[in-house]
Amino acid sequence: MNGEVIATTTARSRLPSALGAGATLLFIGQLHAAPVTESAEQKPTSQLSTVVVQGARLDENQRAETALKEVAGGVNYVDSAAVEKGRVSTSTDIFALQPGVIATQGGGSNDGTRISIRGSGINKGVGYFRAGIFYLFDGLPVSGPGGTPYELFEPLGLSHTEVLRGGNAFDIGSLYLGGAINYVTKTGYNSAPLQVRYEAGSYGYQKRQISSGQVLGPLDYYVSLTDSASDGFQDQTQGKSAGFAGNVGYQFSPQLKSRLYYRYRTTDNETPGYITRAQLKDDPEQANPASVNVRAHRKQPGSTWVASKTQYTFDDDSNLEVGLVYHDYPIDARQGVNRTTWGFSDYSASLKYDRLDTLFGKNSITRFNALRTEHLNAYAKTKVRIPSGITANLPSGALVRKAEYEGSDTVLSASNETEWIDNTLWLSAGLSAVEFQRKAKVSYPVGGEADNPNNPIEKNDWEFAPRVGVRYQINPNWQLFGNLSRTVEAQQSWAYVSGAQVFTSGPATGLNSGGQKLEPQIADTLEFGTRGQFGNNNWDLTFYRSHVQDELLSVIIREATSTADALTSEYNASKTIHQGVELGLDSLLYQNNGDSLHLRQSYTYSDFFYRDDEQFGSNRLPGIPKHNYQAELRYDFSNGVYVGVNTYYASKTPVDFANTKDAGSYNLWGAILGWDSPKKDWNVYLDLRNLTDEKYAASISPTFNANGNDVRAIIPGDGIGAYAGVQYSFR
């Protein structure tokens, strides 16, 4: 809608507060930039000098992107409309070409995508609870003391996604090393009254969606139903899912609005287990025989996320937001000779208040945030699935072990950002206080108390996390930023029942007999960078260095066999360093009569290593390649046709902490051809992946010391594939 926007000094306006992949696509020109709106937070207003602008008003997505650019650190903004021009299977497709975000897909179309930012959850493979990143839907938490289950993260039905890397997620209650990812759902204001979408392709892949959204006076709604199925590239990777996402909003007055959210989703994925590098090169479609023999698979039989958010804007342009969340996420893991059913349910409550004042005659924004998430119920029951070995004489379904968990996370934070030089210099400072409560015990068999003195294990920690930041606007097209932040995170509640202490007799032999002491991970991070535009180039460049104490790591200490399940241990590492470079560049190479040629590139340098560890010295931490480079060269015609080629390069990474063996580097190539109707009704595409049929390790789960042996630690990525899709929007 066209209109006139007027801002004066007396009126306040809303402040939505390489390596190369071969030798073809290289970094060209300068560098690119971009990121929390009502999506992650509603910012207060600021006073501006008189400006009259004739043109279109900013829509919700544009306001969100503008607000993210006001963060004094590394951020990403992902517009779902751009993502939906190709295959949208999992979150891996959302985070393609995003600097600083490592997202890899293995194990078929498993929603348990491996996502890491600045080394967060560095050792977590595909299908694990996500760690080290705070996840939200529409500014309300999904993550909690049990970690982050992945099944609700359906990538269709989103308006956009916001990534605040590292300490830059401070103002939304995140104190995680990797920062926060906020998935923002469509509403009635930015969706079609009816939309249908269908995708199909290699390895039996199919996905369907039907959605609807409208504005009906003061009320608006959006609903989306999806289902998908895949046979999988690798043996033992068949999967299926189905889900619903929706919300209803009501504008009671210009100052008061409220929105209710509901998500429900089920998934069922076969799990292939890990293979060796030699097996990968010989036949990447093969699965671990131990997984095949027991037909290992993992079900999320029905996860629910229900939330409400109410926002009130006071006359003095301060804002209050109250949020409530209920999250239930059961798991049925049938991945070995035993079957473990997990029951988790959490509640979250959040309170955010921000206001604009003047300090020494300058605009000053103050924010307060309180967030608490607590387990209502949390347990794991392990039962006999396939009687064998020590359970050979027990019936299927017999209880072997039960573990129970309690936990809560409470974050209180206050921050201020002041504009010390008009439209030029902003200084910010904040402090968070966080309390972690954890309790874990093995309640059956009772003998666990005798076998492990740490049963039950209980932890209660208070920590403080300060942050200072600066933004300097050299000119309208060039910004410098920097910050010094502390992040603090506790281990997931269930992970306290891990380690080397196991039962030595009875049906539970080999299973953990109790808890182990795990300290919170603390990281101090210095970050600085720049973003802006020069000519036809948009850039975003960030450097960071984190000094990490008690880093939370995981390792396989016993592989699965035909008679026993695998055993994974969580532990605190000695001092480590995480440092890196995050670079994004979007270059307009050609433009004429509505046609354009763009080159988008992202490079992520990840240097993570021990600081003089007694056993591993200065070894690299396994799991994340040191170099990740992505690029896409795409030509867009004025009639809506687009064609492009893309590449992804990842360097080798160790598969063990001793650095005696590695998973090799790889280089993937792809291409895309599509048509996006100028009327915004039809979209069709053909998305080609891994054109050279590269055999590569998409994810690894490391061991302590491979002693140079080719251990089973690899999950392969998909081979060559073709995917086609069509979408129609009834406007």
What name fits each language-model region?
Residues 214, 309-313, 319-325, 331-332, ...:
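Membrane-embedded beta-barrel scaffold of Gram-negative outer-membrane proteins
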Residues 488, 652-654, 675-731:
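C-terminal beta-signal and adjacent terminal beta-strands/loops
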Residues 360, 419-427, 435-436, 538, ...:
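Gram-negative outer-membrane beta-barrel transporters
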Residues 253, 353, 363-365, 371-373, ...:
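Structural signature of Gram-negative outer-membrane beta-barrels, strongest in the C-terminal barrel
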Residues 125, 132-133, 138-165:
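Short acidic/polar hinge/loop motifs at secondary-structure boundaries
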Residues 193-195, 200-229, 234-272, 297-315, ...:
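Transmembrane beta-barrel wall of Gram-negative outer-membrane proteins
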